[in-house]
Amino acid sequence: MATEHVNGNGTEEPMDTTSAVIHSENFQTLLDAGLPQKVAEKLDEIYVAGLVAHSDLDERAIEALKEFNEDGALAVLQQFKDSDLSHVQNKSAFLCGVMKTYRQREKQGTKVADSSKGPDEAKIKALLERTGYTLDVTTGQRKYGGPPPDSVYSGQQPSVGTEIFVGKIPRDLFEDELVPLFEKAGPIWDLRLMMDPLTGLNRGYAFVTFCTKEAAQEAVKLYNNHEIRSGKHIGVCISVANNRLFVGSIPKSKTKEQILEEFSKVTEGLTDVILYHQPDDKKKNRGFCFLEYEDHKTAAQARRRLMSGKVKVWGNVGTVEWADPIEDPDPEVMAKVKVLFVRNLANTVTEEILEKAFSQFGKLERVKKLKDYAFIHFDERDGAVKAMEEMNGKDLEGENIEIVFAKPPDQKRKERKAQRQAAKNQMYDDYYYYGPPHMPPPTRGRGRGGRGGYGYPPDYYGYEDYYDYYGYDYHNYRGGYEDPYYGYEDFQVGARGRGGRGARGAAPSRGRGAAPPRGRAGYSQRGGPGSARGVRGARGGAQQQRGRGVRGARGGRGGNVGGKRKADGYNQPDSKRRQTNNQNWGSQPIAQQPLQGGDHSGNYGYKSENQEFYQDTFGQQWK
């Protein structure tokens, strides 16, 4: 054993034999596992110090440690030893996180984070002793509570609407400052502070779940734009945890029961399927559906599995995205709504029929029918309430209609969405790929317009300003889910037929009756008119012309994508939200979907490679 103490300074080596290295009973096990002598000694030193037991580390951690060279493994173990492990529940996972962080720093050429930049452990300990909460630390987040002590709250886990998002948090701020602030709003279920393992500081945002919805709403009122430090204001809003997935490329002949059965075979936690039928054929769906899971975690796992390319449903790898989350409007606002959202209307139903059916309950301000749904504006709320009570579920022209109160728009949300759309338009300077908001299609000319859009009448776009067209939603009613995807099954088909002149820079035609450029023509790129006369471009984006002409050569890529894709050969495309013309909903951020950019104090996005299922995101910005 004498050789184990030689360190190059033999003349200064103490002669006291009591300083001999003491190994634990697991030292030989580490050597047998294949760890180098010095690495095994370093890890065993941690065992002897009582920081970690051998049983705390699983085989995965030992195998990962073996992949490092000796210097790297020793550096990892030293950092692991120096870390405060008192609040780490899964020490094996924590060690793996340290190894991952070390490799990332090694690639970037950065130094190990200064441990002095972390939280004040004395203050954290005092906080935990005062509140009785627990603290679980991983390399990606610090979780305070969840569940809280019985003395604070002994009920069931809080439901949707009890979680808030906190942004613009100073990077060196921790639980000792956040908890005392937010517990004033009400009892906290848990607080999750997202951490950057490369710096040892937080990412600039956190999530706080309260035990009641009232406490969450109170926290937003109290602390949105609150000055938490001199010159530092945090932003607070209600967070919506998403547990729904959008799935495309669904065979149109499949029923809700068949879809539920099939996807339950390949994913876990599926609770419901939201399916919409074609207005003119109730036996066929629209080629997409929404899958609802137990919680966000199971939805994230299902999304990861379905996007792996290894899982096929009906022999096809479908399109999978996060669905837009449902946001519950303020109850006080909903109590003033006088507009009804009516869906499942038969094709024969007109605005005149609707006006006649609903006017018996009170004076109407306006009736607006769009496809197979409509909005009924009452002069007084009492009339709307009576109409919903009497007409909901009743037969109208052969179809049982469904009625709910329409959701008013969130003006701040629309402003944020417009800002994001403007940013996208600057990034992608392609008029037909990202059409401007609220631009009505050209309506001159005769004949059948292109099937590439939604087919809404021109005045519909002014109607959007009055109410968010995608904001109408009541669980599985269309508003929040169906409208944006109304033309999903045929959104890629280019313009056809004779029509009127397309103005320079005008949006491409939408649906029946909206005229495409005059003559047999497609669209030109970047919104400008084509130079040739009478030439029709083929699939992939064509030139815009006047007059009739002969069929031209195959057009280049760009513009609106032409032609349907067959379901069996449907490759994973870019997000459908990023391909649809003139729809502002396309750039709306989705809860729990990674956003681009790494400045979490500004836009709260982070790169996908850093995402874990618990790392929610929110794209709200505060001014």
From Swiss-Prot:
Pfam family, one: hnRNP_Q_AcD
In-chain residues carrying the UniProt-annotated modification Phosphotyrosine: 373
Ranges of the Sequence repeats in the UniProt entry: 448-450, 451-453, 460-464, 469-472, 478-480, 485-488, 498-500, 526-528, 539-541, 554-556, 557-559
Region annotated Interaction with SMN, chain positions: 518-549
Tissue expression notes: Ubiquitously expressed. Detected in heart, brain, pancreas, placenta, spleen, lung, liver, skeletal muscle, kidney, thymus, prostate, uterus, small intestine, colon, peripheral blood and testis.
Record bears the keyword Repeat: yes
Compositionally biased intervals (Low complexity): 504-522
Compositional bias per record (Gly residues), positions renumbered to this chain: 550-562
Asymmetric dimethylarginine PTM positions: 444, 510, 518, 526, 536, 539
GO cellular component term, pick one: nucleus
Region named Disordered: 497-623
Residues modified to N6-acetyllysine: 221, 363
Sequence positions bearing N-acetylalanine: 2
Domain of life according to the entry: Eukaryota
Ranges for region Interaction with APOBEC1: 400-561
RRM domain mapped to chain residues: 162-241, 243-325, 338-408
Name used for this protein in its record: Heterogeneous nuclear ribonucleoprotein Q
Native species: Homo sapiens (Human)
